[in-house]
């Protein structure tokens, strides 16, 4: 908390509470004018200053275009990024009102009809995100990590070598290797013709806020350059066990297709890429005895069965 208080001082802010602790530690702070803001202490060495500044530029440009996303807030010195140590940075974003549409690992709220409406709205929001992004002209310094074939299934994937997870059984490891081979072929061929550009890359329930009838999108800290369909696949990844999953998938695709085309089969492949990447993500971030390991491996196995048969 002391580190957060020191960082908050760059905005003359007062720390109220810890909100989340994943790639970033996120705190709610109060600003001198009475507004709330989200203070992010970025995970050291996960993203360098140039990447974080690019993410902040993108969010600011999207907000200016009318997208419901957080607005980066300058420090009292006028900078959007504040250094709190070697390779360790802080940033602050405008407060987004509302609540998450759900939480991973729990049943999605609402009846099937309400869930379908929600996913159609998420599809429309993601299409708008991609459409508005394509109208922007990034500065020469704009740089984001690549969510491409190498980023998912290369020798050093962005989130780790999922196929080397120490808790995989021999049968699971074999299926993971099959899935990796499938993705290598599918994504490598798709890279030359797929819709590729800046993506949010973490469209989980926790990152989609609802306030009344409106949706907002938060937490761009995994954003990168990649397959646009990955945003759709990620939005589906927490819902594979939902009874209405086929209808949710179709509603998401239909909502997106109202203003932007997609490739449903590629979306399914990218859904698989996300489920596998999440297994790799846990290897270095969770304790070996954390039950989430088995849950995420089981989910990846379910997704492999759905996509590969």
Regions found by a protein language model. Name each.
Residues 23-30, 38, 72, 184-230:
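Active-site acidic catalytic loop and adjacent metal/ATP-binding pocket
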Residues 280-309:
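ATP/Mg2+ or Mg2+-diphosphate-binding catalytic cores
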């Amino acid at each position: 908390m002391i580190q957060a208080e020191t960082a908050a001082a760059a905005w003359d802010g007062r720390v109220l509470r810890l909100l989340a602790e994943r790639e970033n530690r996120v705190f709610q702070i109060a600003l001198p004018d009475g507004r709330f803001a989200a203070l992010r202490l970025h995970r050291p060495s996960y993203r360098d200053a140039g990447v974080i500044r690019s993410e902040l530029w993108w969010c600011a440009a999207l907000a200016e275009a009318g997208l419901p996303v957080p607005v980066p807030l300058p420090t009292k010195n006028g900078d959007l990024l504040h250094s709190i140590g070697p390779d360790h940075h802080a940033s602050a974003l405008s407060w987004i009102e509302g609540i998450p549409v759900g939480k991973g690992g729990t049943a999605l709220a609402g009846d099937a009809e309400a869930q379908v409406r929600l996913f159609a709205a998420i599809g429309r929001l993601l299409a708008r995100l991609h459409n508005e992004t394509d109208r922007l002209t990034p500065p020469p310094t704009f740089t984001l990590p690549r969510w491409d074939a190498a980023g998912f299934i290369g020798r050093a994937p962005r989130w780790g070598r999922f196929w080397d997870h120490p808790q995989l059984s021999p049968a699971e490891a074999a299926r993971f290797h099959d899935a990796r081979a499938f993705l290598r072929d599918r994504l490598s061929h798709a890279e030359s013709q797929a819709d590729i550009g800046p993506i949010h890359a973490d469209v989980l329930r926790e990152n989609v806020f609802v306030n009344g009838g409106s949706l907002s999108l938060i937490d761009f800290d995994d954003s990168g350059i990649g397959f646009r369909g990955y945003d759709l696949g990620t939005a589906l990844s927490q819902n594979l066990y939902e009874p209405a999953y086929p209808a949710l998938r179709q509603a998401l695709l239909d909502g997106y297709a109202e203003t932007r085309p997609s490739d449903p089969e590629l979306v399914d492949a990218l859904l698989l890429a996300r489920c596998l990447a999440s297994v790799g993500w846990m290897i270095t971030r969770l304790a070996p005895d954390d039950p989430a390991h088995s849950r995420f491996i089981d989910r990846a196995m379910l997704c492999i069965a759905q996509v590969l048969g």
